Amino acid sequence: MRGALRMAAVLTMVPISLVGSTASGSPSSQQEGPKIYISADFEGVTGVVTGEQLGPDGFEYARFREFMTGEVLAAIEGARAAGAGEILVSDSHGNGQNLLIDRFGEDVKIVRSWPRALTMMEGIDDSFDGAIFIGYHAGTTNPEGVRAHTMSSATLTDIRINDYSSNETIWNAAVAGNFGVPVIMVSGDDATAAEAKARLGDIETAVVKWAHSFHSATTLTPKAGQAVIRQTAERAVRRLLAGEIDPYLVQTPVAITVRFKHYQPSQILAYLQMFERIDAHAVRYNAADMEEATRTLVFLRNYRADITP
């Protein structure tokens, strides 16, 4: 991983015309630059305020897929302007099939659909140099934030890593940190940015809207939001190259507490010795690290005896 950073530091001294890229992330000579993982959610995308933008049944979904795709492309363009090389994108919202993959350059790979052992961070490993989170949102215990939730608004009311309440930004940053990869940038609303900085420190954040409530915000236009993301991604990669951002590390072994909306999941999970039922709605389990913690969380959230095919 650090070898790529050393090479990228050399590349950043080469004129941009020699290592340039396009907004579509088209093939270039930048593959020796820092390797970047982009996890893309949807709730934090510019203009998103309700479910009408977030899934195939929403009347605005088709249009907002364009905006989500545009924000990821803007992040790629900014990262490449700073010397980034290989990029892997994780389509991490809903059905995992939101991004318009024909808009991306041939040198960008995209993780799609489910299930995935590492969920929103599938494919990350210690070969990556930095991670960028696009379209993220605040956590379920935050009274502020557009569409604030953690993992599942339908089934979960809290997830805790050791002794603190987590959200998707923090959880996924901890997964990245498990492999020594720092999160260098998060985009979303102002509540998301505040949560990220409170736990991850002085990372780059791109605020594209300001929350009034769960379903209301003052928002930038898509073009303006993409411009902010492009500029922030470029700055984030330059700071990565300068060694200014460290991985987010959690104490291991890690204790995970999962709180459900209803009582029966905790009751049934407690039949297994690895889960301790701590009250009517919550279970706790221990894991060696965040990779194991995530695999276990994926299981307890998704397993059903009637899963098909």
Task: State what each model feature region is.
Residues 54-74:
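Short catalytic helix/loop segments, enriched in acidic residues and glycine
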Residues 1-9:
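Bacterial N-terminal signal peptides that target proteins for export
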Residues 153-179, 188-191:
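Active-site glycine-rich loop that binds ribose-phosphate moieties when present
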